[in-house]
Curated annotation (Swiss-Prot):
GO terms for molecular function: glycerol channel activity; water channel activity. Its main location: membrane. Keywords: Membrane, Repeat, Transmembrane, Transmembrane helix, Transport. Residues 1-66, 122-144, 221-230, 305-332 are cytoplasmic. GO terms for cellular component: plasma membrane. It comes from Laccaria bicolor (Bicoloured deceiver). Induction: Expression is up-regulated during development of the basidiocarp. This is Aquaporin-7-2. Water channel required to facilitate the transport of water across membranes. Does not mediate the transport carbon dioxide across the membrane. The keyword Thylakoid does not apply. Residues 1-46 are annotated as: Disordered. Residues 88-100, 166-199, 252-283 are extracellular.
Length: 332
């Protein structure tokens, strides 16, 4: 052992000594000896059109996640409304299939499934009001807001079209003819207020419900407030929407989401429901299910960030910090 220890520690000038062979344990191979002279084969290049398709797919991936999220929301929500209401006609079904609670569950499941599909890709907004609130309070890029909203509205159009195609024969029977289309079936896709509701009451109902929704979304995504894991967030939103529908859903059919109302309403206009969709109650479609939710989401985010948020991801927090730094500078 002592002789070996001396050999490994004392270098030798002879390149064939034992020390040199221990350092270079791997013998030379023909491949390694000619590595400098042989050219490595190049990886096969993809066709240009495939590269372009991949670039396009990458560019539209997040908006497409919002598109599919809203489409799923409408399929579950409007689909449940169609089943419950259309089945009340004895010529459509032998008995009623569900109740108002069934519709609440349908919309809640639609929210959960939509967020599950899109959450890990686009953030799972699936609501223009939430997208704008995230841009205002959470640093979501304003340049992405138009593409998100467009995708959300188109998702509403396609989701409504799929549900309509599925129930078209039941709608014909319910309406009493193939070319008869009235508010009775339009309300299965778009939102309509109860007759006794005033304009101000309709606006307030949508504003209040969306403010609660926005505040809860901010709470559920606040890492400093015992937020659920990403996998449990859709389930939490499911519970939230069941509660919103059960408590604030009767009077205006709780749109809470401009894309959920405007997308299906656009499809209904193309399906032959006429101008009455947009003339109803002095442009109800604009100020109740669009403007009120957008403002309600802003109010909910403002309340949460003003009184509850303790992170650095809010503009309100930044302004407070700036004012404190300015006061300290003045004291010094």
């Amino acid at each position: 052992m002592s002789g070996q220890h001396q050999i490994t520690e004392q270098p030798s000038g002879n390149p064939l000594s034992r020390t040199s062979t221990l350092i270079q344990e791997k013998p030379l191979t023909p491949t390694s000896s000619h590595a400098g002279t042989q050219k490595q084969p190049e990886a096969p290049r993809q066709p240009t059109f495939l590269i372009q398709l991949q670039n396009i797919r990458h560019a539209i991936r997040k908006p497409m996640a919002e598109f599919f999220g809203v489409a799923l929301l409408i399929i579950f929500g409007a689909g449940s409304a169609c089943q419950v209401v259309l089945s009340t006609n004895p010529d459509v079904a032998s008995s009623a299939r569900g109740s108002f609670l069934s519709i609440n569950f349908g919309w809640a499941i639609g929210i959960a499934m939509g967020v599950w599909v899109s959450g890990g890709i686009s953030g799972g907004h699936i609501n223009p009001a939430i997208t704008i609130a995230m841009a205002t309070y959470r640093g979501f890029p304003w340049c992405k807001v138009p593409s998100y909203i467009l995708a959300q509205v188109l998702g509403g159009v396609v989701g409504a079209a799929l549900v309509y195609a599925n129930y078209i024969h039941a709608i014909d029977v319910f309406e009493g003819g193939h070319h008869i289309r009235t508010e009775a079936t339009a309300s299965l896709f778009a939102t309509y207020a109860l007759p006794y509701m005033t304009q101000a009451s309709c606006f307030f109902s949508e504003f209040l419900a969306t403010a609660v929704l926005s505040m809860m979304v901010f709470a559920l995504t606040d890492k400093r407030n015992h937020s659920p894991t990403n996998g449990l967030l859709p389930f939490a939103l499911f519970i939230l929407f069941v509660g919103l529908g059960a408590s604030l859903g009767m009077e205006t059919a709780y749109a809470l989401n401009p894309a959920r109302d405007f997308g299906p309403r656009l499809f209904l206009a193309m399906a032959g429901y006429g101008k009455a969709l947009f003339n109803y109650r002095s442009q109800y479609w604009l100020w109740a299910p669009i403007i009120a939710p957008v403002l309600g989401a802003q109010a909910g985010g403002l309340l949460y960030d003003t009184f509850l948020n303790d992170g650095d991801n809010s503009p309100i927090k930044w302004r407070c910090a700036s004012s404190q730094e300015q006061q300290l500078a003045e004291v010094v």
